[in-house]
């Protein structure tokens, strides 16, 4: 008799994420390794890793000083999220920031993509019933923290791998957000 394996929704998404990364000349495994290398260097503190990624992007010229401050403030608010109500406030703040940045003709595409991914991410509630909700309820922190770090680390890694080409940062940030979102669900 053939064994039944449970269906894992997370396996199919990786193919399209890899294709997106490859379209910008980024090797998915290298991007993932770069994010993990930064995490290992800075330790388990996700906020510290997020802040360092943003600062390095600003030092490299991928984001302006104003955008650096806005992204650091976004991270400060995001890492303070602990409930669904706080997440909704955070998401409305991120969406308002994204709208303001879209109106600014000088906004960097990297910062715009990062804020856009964060503002439009749907994070499932860790308190909802069901297998995913139960798994997430075991985690003590809100999954938006993983998404913030995934977007920042992915953008930084994409910039480094593409020779600081903004397209690499945009794709890296989007891919990092997707990977973090998938991992939050699985």
Regions found by a protein language model. Give the residues of each.
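N-terminal propeptides/leader regions of secreted preproproteins
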Residues: 1-141
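Membrane-active amphipathic alpha-helices enriched in small hydrophobic residues
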Residues: 140-186
